[in-house]
Amino acid sequence: MPIDAWVREEVEIPEGVEVTIERNVVKVRGPKGELERELKYPGVQIFTEDGKVVIYKEFPRKKDIAIARTFKAHIANMIKGVTEGFTYKLKVVYSHFPMTVKVQGDEVVIENFLGEKNPRRAKILPGVTVKVMGSEVIVEGIDKEAVGQTAANIEQATRITKWDRRVFQDGIYIVEKAGKPIKF
């Protein structure tokens, strides 16, 4: 049962950003690069109008409204990515065994984690750069999902199972997501 006559969500296009929409594929080009994403859902229309991206659906149900707002958030994140970019900061924590973290190609290699002989590896997604500076790992890129997934891959690579995590707190932990500090 429709809730309203229509749902209309708008996203402002800032100066220096170009948005093109062809067959449900939204392309955003800005000073830091270009992103492309397919946003498709039955009955939901996406178009540009007066310097704005408009997401529109007639006679929406609850799910249609949720989809329209999700598309709005995706487009806003794409615009923010090509203008400012996204940065995640991770902290390397160890007590007894000094671990070394380095970038090799499209992987982050963690050596001597809890004294292990075999290095642990975390995948770096395309379009993401990882820098290791002492005990800090910085993950940067224009695609929010790729940057977040790369940071999560690094954090998951040092996950400890079957040991008491209150005692063995070694690992690499996300301390700042997209400029916002994490509360523990």
Curated annotation (Swiss-Prot):
<dbReference type="Pfam" id="PF00347">
    <property type="entry name" value="Ribosomal_L6"/>
</dbReference>
<protein>
    <recommendedName>
        <fullName>Large ribosomal subunit protein uL6</fullName>
    </recommendedName>
</protein>
<dbReference type="GO" id="GO:0019843">
    <property type="term" value="F:rRNA binding"/>
</dbReference>
<dbReference type="InterPro" id="IPR020040">
    <property type="entry name" value="Ribosomal_uL6_a/b-dom"/>
</dbReference>
<dbReference type="InterPro" id="IPR036789">
    <property type="entry name" value="Ribosomal_uL6-like_a/b-dom_sf"/>
</dbReference>
<dbReference type="GO" id="GO:0022625">
    <property type="term" value="C:cytosolic large ribosomal subunit"/>
</dbReference>
<dbReference type="GO" id="GO:0002181">
    <property type="term" value="P:cytoplasmic translation"/>
</dbReference>
<dbReference type="InterPro" id="IPR019907">
    <property type="entry name" value="Ribosomal_uL6_arc"/>
</dbReference>
<dbReference type="GO" id="GO:0003735">
    <property type="term" value="F:structural constituent of ribosome"/>
</dbReference>
<keyword id="KW-0694">RNA-binding</keyword>
<dbReference type="InterPro" id="IPR000702">
    <property type="entry name" value="Ribosomal_uL6-like"/>
</dbReference>
<comment type="subunit">
    <text>Part of the 50S ribosomal subunit.</text>
</comment>
<keyword id="KW-0687">Ribonucleoprotein</keyword>
<comment type="similarity">
    <text>Belongs to the universal ribosomal protein uL6 family.</text>
</comment>
<comment type="function">
    <text>This protein binds to the 23S rRNA, and is important in its secondary structure. It is located near the subunit interface in the base of the L7/L12 stalk, and near the tRNA binding site of the peptidyltransferase center.</text>
</comment>
<keyword id="KW-0689">Ribosomal protein</keyword>
<keyword id="KW-0699">rRNA-binding</keyword>
<dbReference type="InterPro" id="IPR002359">
    <property type="entry name" value="Ribosomal_uL6_CS2"/>
</dbReference>
